[in-house]
Amino acid sequence: MSTARKHTALPKAQILIEALPWLTRHHGRTVVIKFGGNAMIDEELKAAFAQDVVFLRHAGLKPVVVHGGGPQISAQLDKQGLVSEFKAGLRVTTPEAMDVVRMVLAGQVQRELVGLLNQHGPLAVGLTGEDAHTITAVQHRPTIDGELVDIGRVGEITAIDTGAIQALLDDGRIPVVSSIARSADDHHVYNVNADTAAAALAAALNAETLMVLTDVEGLYEDWPNSDDVISRLTASQLEKLLPELSSGMVPKMQGCLHAVRNGVETARVIDGRVQHSILLEIFTDEGIGTMVVPDAPIDVHAARTAHEQGAS
């Protein structure tokens, strides 16, 4: 009987051993995860996400969660009879709408996420970009048809202070950050794109990895003509593709580009509709999304030698 039980358990042991190189590689490193898409509104996906993040923490990584809340914000605006309008892919945010954004992000979405994480122990602590000047912003004015357009309380990040987040990480906590920020100029509170905020925080924290959860499998090679996913590309390759991307993917991929060009080793866009997608991406060879890596460093000596040989 005991021998049979041992054999039954062997596959589990094999799975754990296969994860060993990845555990060794990522131990002690910071991972910034942008939580969004369908994973925010599906109860099973939310629970699986919380399990993944807590697993990372107990496996020796330092996860930081950044979230938005588009669907929840839209629902609350509709409930209060406030018109939700978009320009240049960004929500026009009046002062009244900003009150709703702030309430939903910090008072609803963040609280639910912190609660899910803390079902596994006293780990998660919620904060917003306002707290301890974590994120500072100015009003963002996009150019539409050649003219600057006022879209209200939409912010563009100008500074990141990682002190509060780093203190939480050092204490073994999981920071959960709502993507709103205060301006040092007019002291207004601004709605900041969560993809952009996650990328800026990843760079400022010198994170190993930025992970962005989406409602697609990754970056498609030739959408809509093909559903083949690009598994890996460099910063320069991504930069060339940006003008061709759909509007919803642009801030995500711009965030990935910013991250890997500012010290982050990898940025990954993964399918948040797949349960435990974070663990699959980090602890297996079979990554399930698109990984962006920095351009290879230029070998100055080799380039100079080649130039001299060509000149001779």
Swiss-Prot record:
InterPro entries in the record: AceGlu_kinase-like_sf, AcgluKinase_fam, ArgB, Asp/Glu/Uridylate_kinase, Glu/AcGlu_kinase, NAGK-C
Job description of the protein: Catalyzes the ATP-dependent phosphorylation of N-acetyl-L-glutamate.
Record localization: Cytoplasm
GO cellular component, one term: cytoplasm
Binding site for substrate: G69, G70, R91, N191
GO MF annotation list: acetylglutamate kinase activity; ATP binding
Keyword set includes Cytoplasm: yes
Any one GO biological process: arginine biosynthetic process via ornithine
Keyword Cytoplasm: yes
Pathway: Amino-acid biosynthesis; L-arginine biosynthesis; N(2)-acetyl-L-ornithine from L-glutamate: step 2/4
Assigned protein family: Belongs to the acetylglutamate kinase family. ArgB subfamily.
Residues flagged as site, Transition state stabilizer: K34, K252
Reactions that this protein is recorded to catalyse: N-acetyl-L-glutamate + ATP = N-acetyl-L-glutamyl 5-phosphate + ADP
The protein's name in its UniProt record: Acetylglutamate kinase
Keywords: Amino-acid biosynthesis, Arginine biosynthesis, ATP-binding, Cytoplasm, Kinase, Nucleotide-binding, Transferase
Enzyme Commission number, as recorded: 2.7.2.8
Gene: argB
CDD domains, sorted: AAK_NAGK-C
